[in-house]
Amino acid sequence: MCIRDSIYPTHGLGPLCMILGIGKTDHLAWLTSFATKAVGLRQHMSEDDTTPITLGDIISTQIETQGGTLISLTHDTTLPRPRSLDFEVQGSLGIWDGVNRRIYLEEMNSETWQDDHAILALYESREWQLWGEKALKHDSHHQGMDYIMLRCVAADLTETASADSAGSIRYPATLSDLALWTSVTLLSEISIREHRRVAFGYSSDLQYKKNKNL
């Protein structure tokens, strides 16, 4: 395994980019990645196996946006740990912990975490309102995520969302979005190898201005 980069950035980065309006009101600007030594995989290999392992056990990537937001990505799959996406969103008015399903908002006038279900229900997407119950039933492994995205693809391609919905549903990401998210893998490899901050390689100023009011 002669690789040394963040090999699976999209799982966490995709939802964060949608939340932050990346490609609409903001753009990814710079990336810096760090890697630990490679030990975890080696411990589970035969002593006779001389396959070189260069992928660090933990790859930490910090992404700066043009608007001043910081995105932190961690690839951590070769060391012992319980499964967790460690998904968290924090801003000037509060913080949401997606793993433990809890939230803290400054307006709550409390210094303790609160259960997030009641608050998130106020902001459920149209797609989840339409298909959320079926999604959880048929896609328990990924908590409905795969099901919802596939239904969005089908709705977009056929230009029909559902018999009980008004209007059509569009897939929430473009090919440009997908290319941008996966480019983190290549850019992180450069950052780790050359020990430096790396710019995202697209001319974003004009695009940012054009999309600023979307």
Regions found by a protein language model. Name each.
Residues 1-6, 163:
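Short, compositionally biased segments
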Residues 37, 95, 184-188:
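Alpha-helical scaffold segments in carbohydrate-active enzymes
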Residues 43-52, 56, 60, 64-65, ...:
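C-terminal glycine/acidic-rich active-site capping loop/insertion
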Residues 74, 99-100, 201:
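Short linear motifs in exposed loops
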Residues 141, 145-153, 181-195:
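Stable alpha-helical structural segments in soluble proteins, enriched in small hydrophobic residues
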Residues 190-214:
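C-terminal capping/lid region of NAD(P)-dependent oxidoreductase domains
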